[in-house]
């Protein structure tokens, strides 16, 4: 009953409220988060079963490594170069799709950031594959 009163008071005062164990009394939910550098993945069950969000977060923590975070940093640099040097929107989209692919990440993992940058620059300057 106290939680409901607090929630109702918050609603009247236009203050966001989160009653963790009562999803119907939540204006927002706090997701479980996996963060690897600038890569951030948020998982939520909208308050229905936070334990499952936590379980999924643990699985994703094993799947996504710090290498993924470093890859995002390199993608950001490549994206800036593409935006500065490639005037055609369709070509920019295609290049970004190529560079953000699984194959590109595998190349990054196998050869390292410096080689990947060279590989990315060749794609940016050359014809689409």
Placement of each model-derived feature along the sequence:
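ADP-ribose/adenylate-binding Rossmann-like module
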Residues: 1-30
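Short beta-strand and adjoining strand-loop segment in the mid-core
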Residues: 1, 39-47, 62
């Amino acid at each position: 009953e106290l939680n409901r009163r607090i929630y109702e008071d918050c609603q009247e005062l236009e203050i966001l409220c989160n009653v963790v164990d009562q999803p119907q009394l939540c204006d927002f939910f706090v997701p479980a988060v996996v963060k690897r550098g600038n890569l951030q993945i948020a998982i939520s069950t909208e308050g229905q079963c936070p334990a499952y969000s936590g379980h999924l977060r643990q699985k994703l923590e094993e799947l996504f490594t710090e290498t993924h975070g470093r890859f995002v940093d390199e993608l950001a640099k490549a994206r800036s170069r593409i935006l500065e040097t490639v005037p055609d929107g369709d070509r920019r989209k295609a290049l970004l799709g190529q560079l953000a692919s699984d194959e590109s990440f595998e190349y990054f993992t196998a050869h390292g950031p410096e080689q990947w940058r060279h590989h990315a620059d060749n794609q940016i300057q050359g014809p689409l594959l």
